[in-house]
């Protein structure tokens, strides 16, 4: 148990780790080979998560969920990070932006999502708007009492299984000293809505089976009732979601790095060269020491950022630091593990080459490493009035 965690928190982590080992690991090879998660396996994972009481555990008790703190939820995500993203998607963590649902939206979207009856996906990124989210082209124009949407989104994770989507769309533009500034609104869009389609996206080397899809809007008419939150208030909602998601990326990177390290440590303790275990050679032993030190440091950095969220303290810089360090740490750890395994580490008969491929995307999605460095330095300079 790491410093500062209670016995109850340690039990949460152990419970989820056991779940991943029993319910996720056995199916990973199939998903890696086929690029698909069979419906029966997805349903099985979802049902067992509901039985455990962990489904939508990031939602408050007021909607019948576990109401875990940010630290507790980070522990859950850390252990889920050990397993396949394609499979642990069905562990069920709906976007907590849904807490902004009002009126009929609560019964149509929020409650079915937290009960596991409907799955959601969040759509923000566009072909020309990744890090520059205000550069989005997907737009909605008022037409009578409705909104008419045109444009597209891409790299949308979980869209293949989603029943509805939370889509961020430009709904206006303001002129500022720095040029045009888009106003953004969040919309709830049901699969099958006329003028809205979901199609296959790109083939990725990372996280096979965890598909990214393309959403297209062609004069798609959405009533005002589909607006989530306030009109033109989507950017603030999106920013809040992004920072919370960056903690998830950081803590899942820690979990994945621990699994990779376990492989490397076991191999170093068993593999013999020149008449002794390779772990006894200084070169390998120092690599192992560096790996575990970086993993523990990333873990503590991430939990500290989550703790600041729980205490409602300013945390943007701390979250950016955690995401930056943990995602880059994962890359270093997976690379070192490959080196320790030598040629065997690159063979697809073993999981290390998969972990190596999967690690690459963590430095890109939900805010690139460069964006995190920008946030960190910006906050440091702002504190000095610069």
Predicted ranges, named:
Residues 93-102:
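Helix-loop "lid/cap" segments that line or gate small-molecule binding pockets
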Residues 116-124, 168:
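A short, Trp-centered hydrophobic/proline-enriched beta-strand micro-motif
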Residues 135, 192-221:
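Flexible, small-/acidic-enriched active-site or ligand-binding loops
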């Amino acid at each position: 148990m790491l410093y500062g965690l209670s016995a109850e928190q340690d039990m949460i982590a152990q419970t989820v780790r056991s779940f991943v080992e029993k319910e996720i690991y056995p199916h990973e090879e199939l998903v890696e080979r086929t690029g698909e998660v069979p419906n029966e396996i997805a349903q099985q994972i979802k049902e067992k998560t509901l039985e455990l009481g962990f489904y939508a555990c990031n939602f408050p008790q007021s909607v019948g969920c576990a109401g875990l703190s940010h630290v507790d939820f980070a522990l859950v995500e850390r252990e889920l990070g050990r397993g396949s993203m394609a499979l642990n998607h069905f562990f069920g963590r709906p976007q907590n932006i849904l807490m902004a649902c009002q009126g009929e939206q609560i019964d149509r979207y929020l409650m079915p999502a937290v009960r596991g009856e409907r799955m959601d996906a969040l759509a923000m990124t566009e072909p020309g708007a990744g890090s520059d989210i205000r550069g989005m082209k997907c737009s909605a124009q008022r037409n009578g009492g409705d909104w008419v949407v045109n444009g597209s989104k891409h790299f949308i994770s979980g869209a293949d299984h989603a029943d509805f989507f939370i889509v961020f769309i430009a709904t206006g533009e303001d002129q500022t000293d720095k040029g045009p500034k888009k106003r953004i609104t969040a919309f709830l869009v049901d699969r099958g809505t006329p003028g809205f389609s979901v199609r296959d996206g790109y083939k990725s080397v990372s996280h096979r089976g965890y598909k990214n899809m393309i959403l297209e809007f062609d004069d798609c008419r959405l009533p005002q009732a589909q607006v989530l939150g306030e009109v033109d208030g989507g950017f603030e909602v999106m920013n809040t979601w992004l920072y919370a998601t960056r903690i998830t990326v950081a803590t899942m990177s820690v979990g994945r790095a621990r699994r990779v390290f376990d492989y490397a440590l076991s191999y170093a303790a068993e593999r013999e060269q020149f008449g002794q275990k390779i772990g006894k050679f200084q070169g390998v032993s120092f690599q192992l020491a560096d790996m575990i030190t970086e993993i523990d440091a990333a873990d503590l950095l991430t939990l500290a950022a989550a703790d600041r969220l729980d205490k409602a303290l300013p945390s943007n810089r701390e979250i950016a630091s955690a995401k930056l360090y943990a995602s880059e740490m994962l890359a270093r750890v997976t690379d070192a593990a490959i080196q320790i395994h030598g040629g065997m580490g690159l063979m697809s008969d073993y999981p290390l080459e998969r972990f190596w491929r999967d690690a690459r995307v963590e430095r890109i999605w939900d805010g690139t490493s460069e964006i995190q460095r920008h946030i960190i330095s910006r906050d440091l300079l702002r504190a000095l009035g610069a």
